[in-house]
């Protein structure tokens, strides 16, 4: 049976969510999270440019998938460390490794070297998801949704503006220059976290191996965790399908536009940044499940717009709706899982985010197949189907919860 465990004093002496200067700490966490997660999206607007530098090397098309897969592996293998180690040195250390991996990507002599570097970039960029549960653990229960929303706004800003930045730099400077720019940004984030993060004790003393083994127990223990993970995996697959193919679609004969234009869609999608704090506040007031439903429906609406209105104006409208829907569902699903067990938030986030980014990796891979077979129409059908899968999971989860409640009341 699921139990909601909350601390009477979740906010520790180093609370970054309180009034005054402590809010600067929360903003610093949001900024650092955005810097970290941006690195897994730099390659998407530049994919055509990268492929042109490595002609005949089919591995170049694997770079976005490798980055997403590296992120998923990092979530599974590194994120549990947040429950058993002091988070501050862990977070700072991951940013340093990220800087080294970006330098390796910048000097990659072949497509396969870049694929390997992309795996490491993806794995080390999971530092963003060390920061999110850290922020949640510092917040009082009544402010947890808003706190998560603020940090996740930084994450979404990083995702979206990374495409704008990399599209511009890739078009006017080169893809290697973009990775070089990422190196000092990662180091700045490391310094920022070293200066602003409070010291925070580990929530568990269990060995690393046992922490990994406990993931299976958490997965079977909490039906809410399973439902949230499946829903977000499907939604994020649709999200990455769009962004993986957008640059190829815009560079095609219909538009003949460059990577910089594909990157500009990141600015358009940045409207979705405002969904994060808003979704957090609505989740605090009306419950996170309500917001998850709304986010899944908006995602489906976005793909209907993409499929029926494939012009630039339709893409602009659709990307705003898509990013708003995905972000709303993400913040609210995290709100749900962080309430399950306060001693295991990093491990709960491990399961949730691993599933989500495996979904993203799947979405990137399948989108390339859909593009090769049906071009934009095929990708639109794929994205819509993934959103429908998320809604079906929500329906099944609600029906099972209702059946369990009825059985309990009748006993």
What are these regions (language model features)?
Residues 150-195:
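Helix-loop-helix hairpin linking two adjacent transmembrane segments in secondary transporters
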Residues 117-155:
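Cytoplasmic helix-loop-helix junction between adjacent transmembrane helices
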Residues 10-20, 197-230:
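Juxtamembrane intracellular "pre-TM" segments in multi-pass secondary transporters
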């Amino acid at each position: 049976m699921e139990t909601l465990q909350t601390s009477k004093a979740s906010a520790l002496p180093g609370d970054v969510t309180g009034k005054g200067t402590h809010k600067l700490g929360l903003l610093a966490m949001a900024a650092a999270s955005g810097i970290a997660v941006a690195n897994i999206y730099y390659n998407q607007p530049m994919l055509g440019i990268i492929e042109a530098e490595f002609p005949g090397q089919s591995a170049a098309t694997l770079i976005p998938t490798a980055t997403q897969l590296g992120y998923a592996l990092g979530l599974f293998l590194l994120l549990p460390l947040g429950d058993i180690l002091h988070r501050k040195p862990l977070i700072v250390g991951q940013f340093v490794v990220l800087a080294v991996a970006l330098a390796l990507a910048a000097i990659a002599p072949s497509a396969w070297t870049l694929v390997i570097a992309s795996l490491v970039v993806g794995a080390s960029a999971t530092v963003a998801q060390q920061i999110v549960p850290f922020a949640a653990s510092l917040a009082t229960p009544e402010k947890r949704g808003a706190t998560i929303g603020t940090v996740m706004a930084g994450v979404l800003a990083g995702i979206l503006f990374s495409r704008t930045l990399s599209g511009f730099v890739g078009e006017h400077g080169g893809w290697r220059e973009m990775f070089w720019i990422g190196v000092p940004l990662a180091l700045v984030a490391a310094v920022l976290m070293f200066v602003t993060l409070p010291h925070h004790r580990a929530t568990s003393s269990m060995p690393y191996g046992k922490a990994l083994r406990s993931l299976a127990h958490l997965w079977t223990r909490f039906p809410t965790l399973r439902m949230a993970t499946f829903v977000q995996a499907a939604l994020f697959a649709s999200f990455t399908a769009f962004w993986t193919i957008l640059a190829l679609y815009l560079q095609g004969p219909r538009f003949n536009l460059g990577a910089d234009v594909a990157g500009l869609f990141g600015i358009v999608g940045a409207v979705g940044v405002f969904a994060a704090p808003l979704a957090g506040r609505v989740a605090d007031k009306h419950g996170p499940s309500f917001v998850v439903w709304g986010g899944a429906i908006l995602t489906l609406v976005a793909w209907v717009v993409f499929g029926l209105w494939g012009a630039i104006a339709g893409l602009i409208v659709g990307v705003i709706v898509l990013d708003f829907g995905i972000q709303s569902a993400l913040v609210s699903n995290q709100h749900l899982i962080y309430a399950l067990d306060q001693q295991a938030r990093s491990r709960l986030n491990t399961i949730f985010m691993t599933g989500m980014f495996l979904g993203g990796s799947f979405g990137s891979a399948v989108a390339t197949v859909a593009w090769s077979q049906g071009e934009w129409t095929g990708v639109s059908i794929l994205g819509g189907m993934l959103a429908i899968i998320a809604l079906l999971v929500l329906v099944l989860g609600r029906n099972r919860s209702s059946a369990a409640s009825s059985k309990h009341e009748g006993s």
